[in-house]
């Protein structure tokens, strides 16, 4: 897609960012959401992403998946999704666009990411330690199957808002 003739703001931005992604070893990609759902960290399909997510420690939910049906995310690019590479990446959905807590989580996760990488001076860590409460125990979820809605007549059987956990395989969620 990036080498093709198509043009859009997103494609131009992706073409500009790609050389940076080729050069870096670690990536923290911060986002906010438009729908009400709990914050979550997308760790990718590999153990190294899950390990990095656990070192960062926030948010509580870690979701491992094989990527997005509409195209690769930055955290799925190149060495980040290569089990033989030491490169690792995380994407965090910090919460809703309009909520102050989303910005606070973005800042906290950045500090914790830098701390996990050993890039913060001990004096700074001491100052920052008092700003954040110890994180809650994290929960790891693995997406077993990605389903893409292909018909305009699709409807959910319940009012799902995001972050629901479907505990039993084969549970009807829509038709």
Each language-model region and where it sits:
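Structured catalytic-domain cores with a bias toward divalent-metal coordination
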Residues: 1-175
């Amino acid at each position: 897609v990036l080498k093709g003739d198509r043009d859009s703001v997103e494609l131009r931005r992706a073409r500009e960012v790609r050389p940076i992604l080729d050069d870096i070893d670690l990536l923290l990609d911060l986002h906010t959401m438009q729908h009400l759902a709990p914050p979550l960290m997308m760790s990718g399909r590999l153990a190294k992403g899950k390990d990095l997510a656990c070192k960062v420690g926030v948010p509580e939910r870690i979701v491992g998946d094989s990527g997005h049906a509409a195209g690769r995310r930055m955290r799925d690019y190149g060495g980040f999704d290569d089990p033989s590479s030491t490169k690792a990446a995380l994407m965090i959905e910090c919460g809703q666009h309009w909520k102050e807590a989303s910005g606070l989580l973005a800042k906290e996760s950045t500090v914790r990411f830098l701390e996990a990488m050993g890039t913060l001076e001990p004096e700074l860590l001491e100052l920052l330690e008092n700003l954040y409460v110890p994180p809650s125990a994290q929960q790891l979820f693995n997406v077993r199957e990605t389903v893409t809605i292909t018909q305009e007549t699709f409807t959910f059987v319940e009012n799902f808002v995001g972050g629901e956990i479907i505990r039993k395989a084969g549970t009807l969620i829509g038709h």
